[in-house]
Amino acid sequence: MEQFDALLAQTIDSTLGLRCTLFGYQYSEILRSLMCVYLCGGSCVEDISTHLMKHLSLHPTLRTCSADTILRAIEELTCKNNTYKSASGKSYDFNTADKMNCLLIKALLATGQLKSGQKYDFDFDHQFIETEKYDAKPTYKKFFYDMNNGFGWNRLPKSFMAQNTVFLLMTALIRNFYKAIMQRLKTREFGLRATSRIKTFVFQVHLCSCKMD
């Protein structure tokens, strides 16, 4: 939790803006609270209020917000859909979520996963070009398996895709932070590898804690 604040809190709040001045939770605290759901073995946003709050609230300095606050923040950060009308007359809605996508990139720079001064291509193209080659199924299937089972993508919290887009980007940021921490951690001491999935991480850390007790 402290590493999250040290590496990302300033970046999050400067990009998304201050959510409150006197009372309430900043967006960095809300994202950290959501991160705790998955680093503690939870599977959905509601787990933080149902199972984790009584433990996380014992931290002497860092505050943890409720599931309702996380869900309100998702609504606050939701952007309107853009509608594109094709030449055939069909309309398509898409959501750019510019601020959250910008945060995702800035967070990667803050953790050192992207390097300042380097060139990166973030362009996304919907054009489909038919080829005779197979797609990289192991790559994207592994990613979706990881996000579905480790970071809540199989239990989206909202009914509308615009709101769920914010959640998907929030958890993508958390996943990137987890990857950054695993690169810094002495993983062998916990029976882990830098590429270990988050569920394996949670199990091994709890196992080591039991052995210490």
Where in the sequence are the language-model features?
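Dynamic "connector" segments at or just before major functional cores
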Residues: M1-T139, C208-D213
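Short helix-capping/linker segments at secondary-structure and domain boundaries
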Residues: A6, G41-E46, N176-T187
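Hydrophobic alpha-helical scaffolding
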Residues: C20-F23, Y38, P60, K137, ...
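Short runs of predominantly hydrophobic/aromatic residues within well-ordered alpha helices
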Residues: Y27-L34, V45, V166, M170, ...
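Short amphipathic alpha-helical "interface-anchor" segments enriched in bulky aromatics
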Residues: I48, K137-M161, V166, M170, ...
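General structural signal for alpha-helix termini and helix-helix connectors
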Residues: K54-L58, W153, Q183
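A short, flexible helix-boundary coil/loop motif
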Residues: F177-D213
